[in-house]
């Protein structure tokens, strides 16, 4: 599978590289986060949200909406699932990492998706990117030995536990957390998830 760069023109339909943001303190804070052999996701870390840098992301990237700053760390080389939100997600690569991305527009009416349409993008350490709301994405893949660390910025409450009942029909069956619609691959064995990814469970 060809691994493209986030600076390539082909990335423009999925997101953009963010310029003019200071991320040094956020990167420093990430040094204290765990790096497990599997994948861990923490939606909100108060220490990072209290940094002055957080205010810039809240005001400039989200137009003043309340945000949460968390992380996704680990060691991963498989697609396993794809998710989307009703809002852009900002990722800051603490280490080099690879993102497997798709377009929501390619999801079929029955909410299945052909994994042959997925594209891979290399994100170098220190890079901040915006991943558009219509971009299918999931956990990063490891690009360097030892795993990856990735900052995840989203509107407050995203990816947190549901506090309301959800339907079983249409797009409702994809909701697995607040502001999170997930399509899983059967091989991933994600409990309770709709398995609509068809084709290879891509491995890098």
Where are the regions that the model predicts?
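Active-site region of the double-stranded beta-helix
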Residues: 1-125, 139-147, 151-204
